[in-house]
A protein has these predicted regions:
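Canonical Radical SAM [4Fe-4S] cluster-binding loop centered on the CxxxCxxC motif
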Residues: 1-39
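Glycine-centered loop/turn positions within well-structured domains
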Residues: 16, 126-127, 247, 273
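Residue-level recognition of short loop/turn positions
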Residues: 17, 61, 92, 260-261
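A short, flexible beta-alpha/helix-coil linker loop
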Residues: 25-29, 126, 191-194, 273
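Glycine-rich, proline-tolerant flexible connector loops at the mouths of alpha/beta enzymes
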Residues: 33, 63-64
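Radical SAM/AdoMet-radical enzyme domain recognition
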Residues: 39-59, 67-178, 182-186
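Radical SAM enzyme [4Fe-4S]-AdoMet core and its adjacent flexible, acidic
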Residues: 127-132, 136-239, 243, 277, ...
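Radical SAM enzyme core and accessory elements
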Residues: 247, 251-327
Length: 327
């Protein structure tokens, strides 16, 4: 299987404390800064993947906008890798409108070559947002404004919403009415990871989400590796990421590199290979590429080798917290 989509986490830190991701006190055993990939190491890893054919790169976290060299990394990716045709960012949007030398971060990112921004937003209600993120309700508008700013720049914008029973499952129709086709929506099934207190009773499966959005029309996809099931709802495009109820492992072409340089071939798998240690041990780019290919050849068929969704949940403690993997 060819893996043309690389997701690189730039940091384990986050400025939110979302209930489905981590405890209120956050993840307390974050990796020391000197053990995270440096700017140059991030760029080198991406260059090796790009030369092997990766054409799509997404930068994640933690919260990637907390990393001061973010814009420089984006510019280097586009400068050094003409084969990278899509450069994306997944963010909570809290810092996109912050300014440095009078320039908004979102504008600097667009100028550096970022063409796709996914913004995490789990509620249109400020109080629900506050409860789910454990942050003040006053910050809710900041995220909404950031989404609109991304759309106004002509970026490919998606809103990612994790649907959680008892919190936001009644908002799906409101989300579909909030934006036109310039902002795509993706509703995500809650997934189990170490430290996120996963409770299967609070999972809202794809089939149930569908009942909350009447008049959906299926939208054919020309991307065989797309993990999202796409539909139209009026003027909106609505997608579902169904990792727990209907896996898409057979067509997954994604590979992840964590902020500490660990290569993970599956989001749910506990297996990893340290590219950081190889880099700091003096390997050549060719040797690094061979190490990556060897790891990819051992990728499990589905669910990181845990059999099914129930197995993923049972073995979540073996995996990292989400902020230490990368969204």
């Amino acid at each position: 299987r060819f893996h043309g989509y690389l997701r690189v986490s730039l940091t384990e830190r986050c400025n939110l404390r979302c209930r489905y991701c981590m405890p209120a006190e956050g993840v307390t055993d974050l990796t020391p800064t000197n053990e995270l990939l440096t700017t140059r190491e991030v760029e080198r890893v991406i260059n090796v993947f790009a030369r092997a054919g990766a054409s799509k790169v997404r930068l994640t976290g933690g919260e990637p906008t907390l990393r001061r060299d973010l814009v420089d990394i984006c510019a280097a990716i586009k400068r050094d890798n003409p084969g990278v045709t899509s450069l994306g960012l997944t963010t909570n949007g809290m810092k996109l409108l912050s300014r440095s030398d009078g320039v908004r971060l979102v504008d600097a990112l667009a100028q550096s070559g970022v063409d796709s921004i996914n913004v995490s937003l789990d509620s249109l209600d400020a109080d629900t947002f506050s409860r789910m993120t454990r942050r003040p309700a006053s910050t809710h508008k900041r995220v909404l404004d950031a989404i609109d700013a991304c759309a106004s720049l002509g970026l490919n914008v998606k809103v990612n919403c994790v649907v959680l029973r008892g919190e936001n499952e009644n908002e799906l129709a409101a989300f579909a009415e909030r934006w036109d086709a310039s902002v795509k929506l993706r509703f995500i099934e809650w997934m189990p990871f170490s430290g996120n207190a996963y409770d299967a009773k609070r999972l809202v499966p794809y089939a149930e989400m569908m009942t909350r959005l009447p008049h959906l029309v299926p939208l054919p996809s020309d991307d065989a590796n797309d993990t999202t099931k796409w539909w139209t709802a009026g003027a909106s495009q609505v997608g579902f990421i169904t990792s727990m109820s209907e896996h898409f492992c057979g067509t997954c072409n994604r590979v992840r590199v964590t902020a500490d340089g660990s290569l993970k071939t599956c989001l749910f798998g506990s297996d990893s290979v340290s590219l950081r240690d190889a880099l700091r041990g003096g390997v050549s780019d060719l040797e690094l590429g061979d190490l990556i290919q060897s790891a990819l050849q051992k990728k499990h068929f589905k669910h990181g080798g845990h059999g099914d969704a129930a197995g993923v949940a049972r073995n979540a403690f073996e995996n990292r917290p989400m902020v230490k993997i990368g969204g």
